[in-house]
Amino acid sequence: MTWRATVLTLFPEMFPGPLGVSLAGRALASGLWGLEARDIRDSATDRHRSVDDTPAGGGPGMVLRADVLAAAIDAVDAAADRPRLVMSPRGRPLTQARVAELAAGPGPLIVCGRFEGIDQRVIDARGLEEVSIGDYVLSGGEIAAMALIDACVRLLPGVMGKLESSTDESFSAGLLEYPQYTRPQTFEGRAIPEVLLSGDHGKVAAWRLGEAEALTKARRPDLWAARPAQTIRAKGESQKTPKNKTDG
């Protein structure tokens, strides 16, 4: 079964957007994954196609109605084991581990909120998993949904050129990725570290592991504190050859 993402949104014209180019776009055109963007307004029942109303208890903005959104969700032929997600800054942070789980499944149903948010009752009644891509607020969930989908698509079989491309990246073993270099050998007086040109695979692996650990300690102490030490060490010892990697 082809991995498929179904997006419920007020702006289906935003899709595929950036998902239609580069790795994700080529894979989409090749049938390695599928994408469906559905307009939430199609589930509205009044002549104005209303989808929102004022917040109960007062306050600014508008809230997406539970009845309309529930109808939109129910109109999707979703398998019982298909994840139902809603992009929300109050959700659990999206991690590479969760991305891998989603990529290994049938593909998610993703609800994109707008306005002041979504009526909590539909989140509870339809078992929506709230997911956040960071501690900031966007105008809607569409861009966040694209980020989640792109992260998943890269892990699907046949999408990446080399299996090692995804296993060496940031977060794959609890570390940020080590620095990458390519030609020219010297750029504005800055040379490629000699160890990367040595041909000694063991030294290259040790250097990369050391750089990844140093970057993680400095920039993401939370990741460093939670890292699986044995897994990281094994990863460093198993790395073989230098490589170049692009997503474009």
UniProtKB/Swiss-Prot annotation:
Region of interest (Disordered), ranges: 227-248
Subunit structure: Homodimer.
Broad EC category: transferase
Subcellular location: Cytoplasm
Coiled-coil region list: none
Catalytic activity: guanosine(37) in tRNA + S-adenosyl-L-methionine = N(1)-methylguanosine(37) in tRNA + S-adenosyl-L-homocysteine + H(+)
Role noted for this protein: Specifically methylates guanosine-37 in various tRNAs.
Domain of life, per lineage: Bacteria
Sites where the protein binds S-adenosyl-L-methionine: 113, 133-138
Primary location recorded for the protein, binned into one broad class: cytoplasm
GO biological process terms held by the UniProt record: tRNA N1-guanine methylation
Gene Ontology cellular component list: cytosol
Residue ranges with Basic and acidic residues bias: 234-248
GO MF assignments: tRNA (guanine(37)-N1)-methyltransferase activity
Record gene name: trmD
Organism listed in the record: Rhodopseudomonas palustris (strain TIE-1)
Protein name: tRNA (guanine-N(1)-)-methyltransferase
Family: Belongs to the RNA methyltransferase TrmD family.
Tagged with keyword S-adenosyl-L-methionine: yes
